């Protein structure tokens, strides 16, 4: 008799803000500006094993609002949205896409809300982050890693 095949297990244990910072270097004068700022977004993901089947995934966004004409930063907000995930019975070759695509897709709506809420509470109009295709970013990183270092393990950090 064959042993029953164990089903993959994926559980969201916790979603939390790991780190959050806001800088308004030119307050209060910046609140008198009428120019619409240029918004720049930098996005990164990382993951690590906490223990055994428990993983932490972090999606980091740095949003900079700059007054282009005056080359002045209105505000800079950086948020690290994290999650703890229990992943069991997933084949080794499938764990990286779970950590690099599925988990960031789960965390991103929380990150978007954290950024928007922080910016609004700081006295600025909300910044709404557009959806991000983490699968495309993950695949691009895989291709870049395969071309640049075919014998090295892939770094899961993504930049957008």
Swiss-Prot record:
Q: Name one GO biological process term.
A: protein folding
Give the UniProt keywords, A-Z: Chaperone, Cytoplasm, Protein transport, Translocation, Transport
Q: Does the keyword Transmembrane helix apply?
A: no
Q: Quick check: keyword Magnesium in the entry? A: no
Q: Where in the cell is it found?
A: Cytoplasm
UniProt feature coiled coil, ranges: none
Where is the chain membrane-spanning? none
User: What one GO molecular function would you report for this record?
Assistant: unfolded protein binding
Xref: InterPro entries: SecB, SecB-like_sf
Entries under Gene3D superfamilies matching the protein: SecB-like
A Gene Ontology CC term for this entry? Answer: cytoplasm
Pfam families from the xrefs?
A: SecB (PF02556)
Its assembly, as annotated, is:
Homotetramer, a dimer of dimers. One homotetramer interacts with 1 SecA dimer.
Function, in words: One of the proteins required for the normal export of preproteins out of the cell cytoplasm. It is a molecular chaperone that binds to a subset of precursor proteins, maintaining them in a translocation-competent state. It also specifically binds to its receptor SecA.
The protein, known as = Protein-export protein SecB
Q: Which organism is it from?
A: Nitrosomonas eutropha (strain DSM 101675 / C91 / Nm57)
This protein's gene is called secB
């Amino acid at each position: 008799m064959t042993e029953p095949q164990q089903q993959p297990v994926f559980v969201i244990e916790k979603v939390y803000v790991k780190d959050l910072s806001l800088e308004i270097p030119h307050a209060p004068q910046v609140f008198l500006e009428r120019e619409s700022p240029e918004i720049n977004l930098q996005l990164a993901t990382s993951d690590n094993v906490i223990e055994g089947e428990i993983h932490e995934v972090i999606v980091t966004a740095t949003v900079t609002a700059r007054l282009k004409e005056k080359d002045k930063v209105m505000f800079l907000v950086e948020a690290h949205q994290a999650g703890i995930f229990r992943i069991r019975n997933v084949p080794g070759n499938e764990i990286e896409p779970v950590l690099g695509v599925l988990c960031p897709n789960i965390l991103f709506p929380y990150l978007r809300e954290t950024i928007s809420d922080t910016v609004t509470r700081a006295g600025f109009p909300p910044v709404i982050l557009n959806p991000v295709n983490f699968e495309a970013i993950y695949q691009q990183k895989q291709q870049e890693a395969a071309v640049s270092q075919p014998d090295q393990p892939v770094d899961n950090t993504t930049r957008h």
